[in-house]
UniProtKB/Swiss-Prot annotation:
The modification Phosphothreonine is found at residue 132. This is Meiotically up-regulated gene 35 protein. Transmembrane segments: none annotated. The gene is mug35. GO terms for cellular component: cytosol. Keywords: Cytoplasm, Meiosis, Phosphoprotein. The modification Phosphoserine is found at residues 127-128, 141. Coiled coil: none annotated. One of its GO terms (biological process) is meiotic cell cycle. Its main location: cytoplasm. It comes from the Eukaryota. Residues 126-176 are annotated as: Disordered. Has a role in meiosis. It is found in: Cytoplasm.
Length: 234
């Protein structure tokens, strides 16, 4: 391994992973938010995987992997420039890919997150034009359907044009609407909007603590006229 490659792997020195405190200061703010607030408290490590919601078995498998993962075994697979003054490095280990961000302005390295490689392959295959729609449904479903963005899933659940034409009335509730899809879709929507908002705030010098404080203030103002109570510890 070259010295340059060793430097790129520096923030992976947090592994093997034993507790969430090891993530302090070495992950991106968005990943920190995912681990602290989006993942279940007793399965916080699930927040590290950003392209898939894990089953109980997959969560246990990931935890065992993270506890024994040696970053020196990671294989470098590529780099990119997701935004100005940021270089992205991608490493592969086991069934996961690790993305590391190098911020050129302050020369800091942050772990962006993990990707489930199998899920990436399914999504890539689903979006390619090599297969017919019938082949896609047979080979990829139902996983591809559950991983589609919220609004795409919503459209798939709507009545067909023929149904609408025959009844002349829109169906108020989709026939096959799943509460699970709705929840996951809203999770994605909140995460996407939060990420965009944080990017703007961080570029203007706002810290993570300030960002979270303003989010809390926004929630409190919304709860003023509600019988719901906002948690005391956000």
């Amino acid at each position: 391994m070259t010295n340059e490659r060793h430097d790129e792997l520096a923030c992976l020195g947090i592994f093997p992973l034993k507790n969430p405190k090891q993530l302090d200061g070495v992950v991106t703010p968005i990943l920190q938010l995912r681990v602290k607030f989006l993942a279940p408290t007793d399965r916080w490590w699930e927040g590290l995987v950003i392209n898939k919601d894990l089953s109980k078995e997959e969560s246990e498998e990931l935890w065992k992997f993270l506890q024994s993962f040696d970053p020196r075994s990671a294989k470098f697979v590529g780099r990119g420039t997701p935004e100005d003054h940021v270089i992205s490095y991608l490493f592969e280990a086991g069934k996961y890919e690790f993305e590391v961000f190098f911020y050129q302005k302050d020369h800091s390295l942050k772990l962006m997150g993990l990707y489930d490689k199998t899920q990436k392959q399914l999504l890539r295959r689903d979006s390619s034009g090599d297969l017919t729609s019938t082949d896609k449904e047979r080979d990829v479903s139902p996983v591809s359907h559950s991983e589609k963005p919220y609004w795409d899933r919503y459209d798939l659940d709507q009545p067909s044009n023929q149904d609408v034409e025959e009844s002349r009335n829109l169906v108020q509730e989709p026939k096959h609407r799943s509460k699970k899809y709705d929840r996951l879709g809203l999770d994605e929507l909140v995460m996407e909007q939060t990420a965009s908002l944080w990017k703007i705030c961080s570029r203007n010098g706002m810290s993570v603590d300030e960002f979270l404080r303003f989010i809390r203030m926004g929630l409190e103002s919304n709860f003023q006229h509600s019988n719901q109570v906002i948690p005391t510890h956000f």
